Amino acid sequence: MNENKLLGLAWISPYIIGLILFTAFPFVSSFFLSFTDYDLMSPPVFNGIENYRYMFTEDTLFWKSMGVTFAYVFLTIPLKLAFALGIAFVLNFKLRGIGFFRTAYYIPSILGSSVAIAVLWRALFAIDGLLNSFIGVFGFDPVNWLGEPSLALMSVTLLRVWQFGSAMVIFLPALQNVPQSQYEAAMIDGASKWQMFMKVTVPLITPVIFFNFIMQTTQAFQEFTGPYVITGGGPTYSTYLFSLYIYDTAFKYFDMGYGAALAWILFLVVAVFAGIAFKSSKYWVFYSADKGGKNG
């Protein structure tokens, strides 16, 4: 028995070591660094809550980047989940070649976070890019998608929305698990297709909607590659997400103490947002009837 335990520990030890070295240690050390003035050139100097005081009272870029991040999240999540659920609903039908389309819609989720796709997206939305060439065929003037502050954030948002495949794959089995008897009962009551979708399908898959909402929101708050490669946070900070601000502070200006403080604020924002979502879920997330209906 002891040999089995030792063997088990030996197998999981690489994961435990990696967790300690690359997750737990940076997590704890960043908390202490957030109370210091540290530029990598000299030892950290404790400065109390000065980083946080400056952040909330003097740093206008902090509030600007936080506002852009919330705008990005509130634009991205509803659109992405709506697309994912809509496409999953269509792919749930038994049609010829449906397997190909399921794969095709999922691929962007695998490739979407790569630098190569971000470069391609930048070329697509450039002033002389493919999108402007396409609308030029219909007589429209070129649009400066990435140079206009009012359009740049939407252009970056579309990249995130395009990566709806992972959420779609999670929605698909949930739709397949909705009991057919529920639809039959609704049809007998004279419900339309739209009413069946809203009154039967959606309530029965709310646990999956909630899961996707939490996962996608957490990822959206931490989005970095797309905005960094496509616009670099511009123009005029219109796409300057909070993650870009953390990166620039820590690795461009080497202000590690302040960068750590910013990272902890982002962590707290995501934690509070998730906490509110979990707290409110008891009012709109429904579980199977054999578990008592609402999540208590």
Briefly describe each language-model feature range.
Residues 3-296:
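A structural signal for multi-pass alpha-helical bundles of membrane permease subunits
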